Amino acid sequence: MKMNKNHKTVLVILNIIVSFLISSCSSPKEQVRIGNGTFTIEGKDIQLICGEMHYPRIPHEYWRDRLKRARAMGLNTVSAYVFWNFHERQPGEFDFSGQADIAEFIRTAQEEGLYVILRPGPYVCAEWDFGGYPSWLLKEKDMTYRSKDPRFLSYCERYIKELGKQLSPLTINNGGNIIMVQVENEYGSYAADKGYLAAIRDMIKEAGFNVPLFTCDGGGQVEAGHTEGALPTLNGVFGEDIFKVIDKYQKGGPYFVAEFYPAWFDEWGRRHSSVAYERPAEQLDWMLSHGVSVSMYMFHGGTNFEYTNGANTGGGYQPQPTSYDYNAPLGEWGNCYPKYHAFREVIQKYLPAGTVLPEVPADNPTTTFATVELKESAPLRSAFHQTTQSENVLSMEDLGVDFGYIHYQTTLQKAGKQKLVIQDLRDYAVILIDGKQVASLDRRYNQNSVTLNVSKTPATLEILVENTGRVNYGPDILFNRKGITSQVLWGNEKLTGWSITPLPLYKEKVSEMEFGETIKGVPAFHKGTFTVEKKGDCFVDMSQWGKGAVWVNGKSLGRFWNIGPQQTLYLPAPWLKEGENEIVVFEMEDTGKRVLQGLNQPILDSLGIDKNYQKGQRRAVVGTPILEDGDLALKTTLQETNEWQSFDLPVATTLRHFCIETLASYTEDNQACISEVELIDDKGQPIDKTKWEVVYVSSEQADKNLGIAENLFDGDISSFWHTNAAVESNHPHRVIIDLKEIYKVSAFRVKVRKGSFLSGKVKDINIYGRPLSTKYIQ
């Protein structure tokens, strides 16, 4: 067909238009930019006022409720970790439905006028089991996590690719509301492998996340944790340090504190973390007034339903409870603490002119139910589905189990009084002989043996082991297998011939068990019913029980433990029925009491009797603390005097953990002895010592508490910390103290023990400070 000149001109123009349209579709408009010291979103400069909240820790039915409360407090952004092990519980099998539908959570945030900062890890910490890693990674015993191990990176890539399919369409450049994506998480507190960081960064880009990337680290760890092409941000840093640190890597900012801590998380057996609102509100005010973008960790903590809590090992093995209330502005059940209203007042001062915040939604209704007694029981074996025969013990990971419990059974052939040793117990064990419970062992106290008297043989030995939470922070994430991870000895004999049954009870259909007469004194399930007239949030009071887990209408509320501080379990209103409701309790440590009730307020700060604690016993610390040059706050020499000595820090330091390291003594015995220490805040005031807690001590004179590390801050100058004189040791000696709150410290005061002829008169010391937990190496 012959074409004239006009036809050709029209075709050329059409081709240009089509090419432009294709180009426009394939290259979305850049809606978020970082430059000139600011964040620019949709053409406008913005100060990010952000809060962290986690979709698995909030009932799906309450996502919108919590997001509305975030917007009403003044937040313009929410930050959210993505939990790998919540989506890929078995290799290659992904779940993004229901409670795991993070895309719906993000779209709901957009509908409520909130941007989203995505934190996909793959490692996330978050006081979550294994820091978000799936437990099946542990099957490959020689694989190294958070490294360039090719096998590990291949699993990371599969996960991130799948995440990209689900979430990359929701970036702001694709019409959604995801404005930034984080690369890894606090990596500088773990290692400094730039190749590994670059690999994770590139995976995120290749997965389609076409928005700015960032890293987050403590102030002294940015060098190790930062990667090219990602904005460096800070965790736990306050004041002028924000500018000093960031300017080393990105002169002029923008400045973003990706984790600002209004409070802290809890652990089993310790008091509930509670921080008054005044100081955090002042810190928030300072940051906003100085143009710093900020994300509060947490804005709303929520709940570790099922068995998802993690554990730390900084001060011994420290598992976290079911409640992740965090003493955040918005409490576990969506309640507004005074901190919420104080923060709202601060934020309102910095909103654009004419901006009116939404009204704070009314409190959600609560309900109660009367005391009920659970009279029906089912034996532990009701949950036995698949038993494996093995010559040697196997771990939970060997059997493909992520959470819950594992049951071991064998036969004892030798009678008499012998020591039963469970090597590398992870984490809590109940021991039965011929069906009778005879002992329990607790990893928190490094308990791994008990002496038993077996009068008749053969005798049946049963060991029920609970995974109370995989380590989520520090080098110990490499040692996270659960159950019995080595061997069991009876006297000097290694026990063999095991029947092993995994019990991942969080997905157990407890309602279908056959219940009958009550069972006492051994692990068992107990069932009852209660009635509510109207649905409302409720708190199941488990303070009369020992240790176990609860289901209501088939929904797993998580675990309880009467040592506290948590004594209630949160029961969300959507999981209740008007009228009769079924409750099932698994009791691992039976108290003989079968009563419970529903309250309209939680009990989060009530310590009970810890049956495994022995007087004078300190939590078993695993490893040696790593002290980094970036955390060194003061290096000085003490005078040979008994008077108080004061030292200004060269630079005021933001810290929560601080370490006293002795390097030399005036005496020649290599001992160390100090009577009392004080820290002075940035306003020149002594910091309250009533909440301080020792999390590590390299040596102490523990006999009759004569020279324990707690004497350093007991307010009594006649008491003292003294290294163990009965054990030969050299400097350095170290004590690490948790202040339980982040402070800006300007000075250090110390008083050595009074007396002329005393051992351990300290001469040279270092003081280290970290806003985050101390890390350790084995």
Which residues does each predicted region cover?
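Extended substrate-binding grooves/exosites of carbohydrate-active enzymes
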Residues: 30, 34-62, 68-72, 93, ...
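Catalytic domains of carbohydrate-active enzymes, especially glycoside hydrolases
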Residues: 62-83, 101, 112-117
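Aromatic-lined carbohydrate-recognition surfaces of secreted/lumenal glycan-active proteins
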Residues: 119-121, 172-185, 203-224, 230-236, ...
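Carbohydrate-binding surfaces of carbohydrate-active enzymes
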Residues: 156-182, 193-194, 201, 209-210, ...
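Disordered, acidic Ser/Thr/Pro-rich linker "stalks" and the adjacent N-terminal cap
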Residues: 386-391, 553, 619-655, 666-745, ...
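Extended extracellular/luminal ectodomain segments enriched in beta-structured repeat modules
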Residues: 413-419, 532-539, 652-657, 730-732, ...
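Aromatic-lined ligand-binding clefts that engage carbohydrates, nucleic acids, or primary amines
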Residues: 418-432, 461, 530-553, 560-561, ...
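Short beta-strand-plus-loop segments that form exposed binding edges in beta-rich domains
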Residues: 463-469, 585-591, 661-668, 753
